[in-house]
Curated annotation (Swiss-Prot):
PANTHER family: BIFUNCTIONAL PROTEIN GLMU (PTHR43584:SF3), NUCLEOTIDYL TRANSFERASE (PTHR43584). The keyword Oxidoreductase does not apply. The gene is glmU. It comes from Tropheryma whipplei (strain TW08/27) (Whipple's bacillus). Binds 1 Mg(2+) ion per subunit. It comes from the Bacteria. It is found in: Cytoplasm. Its cofactor is Mg(2+). This is Bifunctional protein GlmU.
Length: 601
């Protein structure tokens, strides 16, 4: 049986504050793009479908290649705001396009949807279906002009909304949000409290505790001391969400003053409203009908429709002493939206003004729920995630001597009794088996490290180190290299695209490139494998049991037979047969008293 949950991940933000040519959600933290962390968490919830709303084609390409079961929907460059983002995904929530059925499906979304409610000119909530909760049960259908979406098919009843730039949302929190029944509510959002909420949308509640609206930071008055903020994570009933977005879109397109998007029943009568100058601040008034009498600012009169804090009450009473003066209503949906965008947060107020409840889950893990907008926040987020990763491995049985100087990607796999010394960086698809000692100051990426190996002050990239091998100090193991069991790669050795057999040694100051070295081989100090002729790379083959002298140069392609020896300083250009000794014979010439004759004294 399919899940009734769909997940929409918003990844269409421009990310200008990152000051980067790379899309914000593709910036890495702990080895993966931010959007990948969000998708991995989403998949654990086992939704019937996951939809990513994107703007940059590079985001789509990444998801196609990495998460083939995820649907991608393009948000038009002409449409701004999180509301438009979710609106773009609605048809594909309702369609039969499941990721596991239609992988790599890309859908264009340019607000071409036919709105089947009232015409724009008669957009009146008093007659709209949102004011008739019984009629809402039948739902409203939104479809594309292409006719891809079928109105009579079953579709997910709930939509979980996540943000691709909020990568640390705990799975336990998402699980609670999804499992907790909405009961009489149309949705639920996740909130948190911040000592300094600057920059985040504030959650305003009535004096019964119900969520009434979310106010953007730029619209908060100095008198409003609200530290409960919206994290952006929320779950909504699909039908109600679609209806709300339908209505908000119509009001947005019509460029109305937005007073039509709420009910006007809170005004005593329109004639009771006077002029905007009688409001607390003129800019807060959209129309006179949005005013309420200053004489009626007691909480029991305003609740639950009009949300005014105690600080505003006091200011109003001090500035408007005589009867008949008015205070500006603060609940006109979208009236304070200074940007040309449709915000998803406006649906909260829209629901409230139509008698529909939005629940909340409040968490103390505020640092895990804040978005990434710039490089400072990116670094902070990565540090938080790294601390979590280190703690998890410590609890699993890995000893990490210096958590403060150790960085481990989320994709790394460690085993029990691994010892990580200070200054190590483990990244990519690295896997380290039990008993290995890593560090100090080792960098390992996309590599396999076998049991009981030692890697000290070395860099290893896309390589395989078998059980019992010793690497370093100051060794550089490059891609395509395999170091055999119980082998040794010593100080200042670089190895690239080579196989080193079991119990072989490359102990000192050597470059090994494009080589196959057998077992029980000893490579003398200062050996160079000359593998490049200026156009092509060539291979050197060293058979089992070979011993090479110091300072050898092997000019590839060349083969050295089993058990052969080479003399110090030899340049090996030709193949050497099994068991032979090969020397580059240069007659030594000695000049007596040379230094004295030179005048060295």
């Amino acid at each position: 049986m399919k899940s009734d949950l769909a997940i929409v991940i918003l990844a269409a933000g421009r990310g200008t504050r990152m000051r980067s040519s790379t899309p914000k959600v593709l910036h890495n933290i702990a080895g993966l793009p931010m959007v990948a962390h969000v998708l991995r968490g989403a998949q654990l919830l086992k939704p019937c479908k996951t939809i990513v709303v994107f703007r940059d084609v590079r985001v789509e390409q990444y998801i196609r290649n990495t998460f083939p079961d995820v649907l991608t929907v393009a948000q038009s460059d002409a449409l701004y705001g999180t509301g438009f983002g979710v609106f773009s995904a609605i048809p594909w929530i309702r369609s039969e396009s499941y990721g596991n059925t239609y992988p790599n499906t890309r859908h264009e979304s340019h607000a071409e949807y036919e709105l089947d409610a009232c015409d724009l000119d008669t957009c009146n909530p008093a007659s709209d279906r949102l004011n008739d909760q019984e009629s809402l049960k039948g739902g409203r259908h939104i479809h594309t002009k292409s006719g891809d979406v079928t109105n009579n098919k079953p579709f997910p009843s709930r939509v979980l909304i996540l943000y691709a730039d909020v990568p640390l949302v705990p799975f336990q929190l998402l699980e609670e949000l999804v499992r907790k029944p909405l009961k009489q509510a149309v949705g639920a959002i996740v909130t948190t409290h911040l000592d300094n909420p600057k920059g985040y949308g504030r959650v305003m509640r009535d004096n019964l505790g119900s969520i009434a609206k979310i106010i953007e930071d730029s619209n908060i008055l100095p008198e409003q001391s609200i530290n409960e903020v919206n994290t952006g994570v929320g779950i909504f009933d699909t039908e109600y969400l679609q209806d709300a977005l339908n209505k908000l879109l119509k009001c947005h397109i019509a460029h109305s003053p937005n007073q039509d998007c709420v009910t006007n029943q809170d005004c005593v009568t329109n004639q009771d409203c006077v002029t905007n100058q009688d409001c607390v601040t003129n800019q807060d008034c959209v129309t006179n009908q949005d005013c309420v009498p200053a004489a009626h600012t007691e909480a029991h009169v305003l609740s639950p429709k009009v949300i005014v804090t105690e600080q505003i009450h006091k200011k109003a009473e001090s500035e408007h002493q005589h009867a008949g003066q008015w205070m500006c209503r603060q609940d006109t949906v979208g009236a304070q939206n200074t940007k040309e965008e449709m915000r998803l947060t406006d649906i909260v107020e829209y629901f409230y003004n139509n008698g529909l409840r939005v629940n909340s889950i409040t968490t103390s893990d505020s640092e895990l729920l804040l978005g990434v907008n710039n490089r400072v926040q990116l670094a902070k987020t990565e540090k938080i995630l790294n601390d979590q990763i280190i703690k998890r491995w410590q609890l699993y049985g890995v000893t990490i001597k210096s958590p403060e100087t150790t960085w481990i990607d989320s994709t790394v796999q460690l085993s029990e009794d691994v010892l990580i010394l200070p200054g190590c960086i483990l990244s990519g698809r690295t896997r380290i088996e039990e008993g290995a000692v890593i560090g100090p100051f080792a960098t390992i990426s996309d590599s396999f490290i076998g049991k009981n190996t030692i890697v000290k002050r070395a860099e290893i990239i896309d390589a395989r180190i078998e059980e019992g091998a010793v690497i370093g100090p100051f060794a550089f193991i490059r891609p395509g290299t395999v170091i055999g069991k119980d082998s040794k790669v010593g100080t200042f050795v670089e190895i690239k695209q080579s196989n080193i057999g079991p119990e072989s040694k490359v102990p000192h100051l050597s470059y090994i490139g494009d080589a196959n070295i057998g077992s029980h081989v000893n490579i003398g100090a200062g050996n160079i494998f000359a593998n490049y002729d200026g156009k092509l790379k060539h291979e050197t083959c060293i058979d089992d049991g070979v011993k090479t002298g110091a300072g050898n140069v092997f000019v590839a392609p060349v083969k050295v037979g089993r058990g052969a020896y080479t003399g110090a300083g030899s340049v090996i250009r030709d193949d050497i047969e099994e068991g032979a000794l090969s020397l580059t014979e240069l007659k030594q010439k000695t000049i007596p008293k040379w230094a004295e004759n030179r005048g060295d004294g």
